[in-house]
Amino acid sequence: MKTIAHLSDLHFGRHDETAAERLLGDLSELRPDLVVITGDLTQRARHSQFAVARAFLEKLPRPVIVVPGNHDVPLYDVIQRFVGRLARYRRYICAELQPFFADDEIALLGLNTARSATFSNGRISYAQAAAIKSVFADVPAGRLRILAIHHPLAVPVPGGDLLPVGRAAMARRAMIEAGVGLVLSGHFHRAFSGDLPGSDLVADGLILFVHAGTAISTRLRGEPNSYNLLRVGPESVTCTVRAFFGTHFGDADSVHYALVGGRWAQQQ
């Protein structure tokens, strides 16, 4: 079993300093095997915000896998937005926009969905869908295949103002073909884990979707700052939401999932 700390939507530049300090302390104590950050490290992609984000990342337990979010693309600098949209991210955070991590139990691929002209809601490219299949094709059997992206592939409650990433159906088909079992994302600032069925999904329950809330941002959406602590194995995932209670992070909710007949099912 591996322990993964899944953080998202830090939004340095509009963040809670106390929450940031307590988060570092919590992770230092828990010592996860892997830290995954699914985008929006900054509020407005400014040099100063990226510098603070970089200093924060350097204090995290290693290894760390990071993907960008739409807030990591400059909003008001129009030239930079379209000519060098992720130049600052690549300078301060990570030059690799398709990071990959693998050990003897898991394989994790990160993709940049803050691309094209659709920064806000994101989009998966045809090349990225192909990469999902080609990268995981080389992963030995018996390892949990994980995809990390900023924009979710589906919304927990359809019909509201939240939208899935562009070309989500194409991406989900590629993931099913590649044997991806777990998807980590953020963007909505709301914690969620479970199945997100849809008419364009080949079969329900094949993929477990986990959304992280905002770890330290003051841009809250009806729930406290939080991150996910995952205990994962080839056929099981326990997702624990670690919420910020003003002075410390602690367990707020925990759900266990297991593969039953090739499909994820919540266990009592």
Q: What is each model feature region?
A:
Residues 7-8, 35-40, 64-70, 112, ...:
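Active-site neighborhood of phospho(di)ester-bond hydrolases with catalytic His/Asp-centered motifs
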Residues 13-15, 43-48, 70-78, 116-120, ...:
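Active-site environment of divalent metal-dependent phosphoester hydrolases
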Residues 21, 49-53, 125-130, 161-170:
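Charged helix-capping and loop-helix junction motifs
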Residues 51-134, 139-141, 174, 202-203, ...:
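Extended active-site neighborhood of metal-dependent phosphoesterases/phosphodiesterases
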Residues 141-156:
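Short acidic, glycine-rich surface-loop motifs adjacent to enzyme active sites
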Residues 160-238:
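Conserved beta-sheet core of the metallophosphoesterase superfamily
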Residues 231-268:
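A short C-terminal boundary segment appended to hydrolase-like catalytic domains
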